[in-house]
A protein has these predicted regions:
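Accessory alpha-helical/coil subdomains and C-terminal extensions
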Residues: 1-33
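C-terminal active-site/capping subdomain that shapes the small-molecule cofactor and substrate pocket
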Residues: 31-130
């Protein structure tokens, strides 16, 4: 919600050249929710400053939402499609890398903050540099 009201947000200048890492957490939200928040970023002009967007693979199963394989695949596709559509409304060329195992997915990779990242879109590779 903070992206829509402006509370606790970084200054625009702090976003120049930043790689944005996002994930939907364990809530298993409907696809429109992350899309809505990303539109808030877009309306602020952030996708003109951000260098790339990396999206964690959405968690698609929880004890109270025991989705089968088909339901999980459908949910993840809806999430991916909505994220791309939302970002592309504001920046048609920014690299969007999706379905990485970080955040609240299973399995998950820990990502250290404060380092650098090298993204090669031609080789389709990502390297964390500490």
């Amino acid at each position: 919600m903070e992206s829509t009201v402006g509370k606790y947000l970084p200054k625009d200048d702090d976003l120049d050249g930043v790689v944005l890492f996002i994930e939907t957490a364990e809530d298993i939200p409907e696809a429109w929710i992350p899309a809505y928040l990303l539109r808030g970023f877009g309306e602020r002009g952030w996708f003109d400053k951000i260098k790339s967007v990396i999206v964690g693979r959405p968690k698609a199963w929880e004890f109270d939402k025991p989705n089968n394989a088909e339901q999980k695949a459908k949910y993840r596709k809806e999430q991916r499609d909505e994220i791309v559509t939302s970002i592309r409304q504001y920046n048609s060329t920014i690299p969007i890398i999706q379905n990485l195992d970080f955040g609240h997915s299973d399995p998950q990779i820990l990502l250290p903050s404060g380092g650098s990242i090298k993204i090669n879109t031609q080789e389709k590779s990502i390297k964390l540099v500490m």
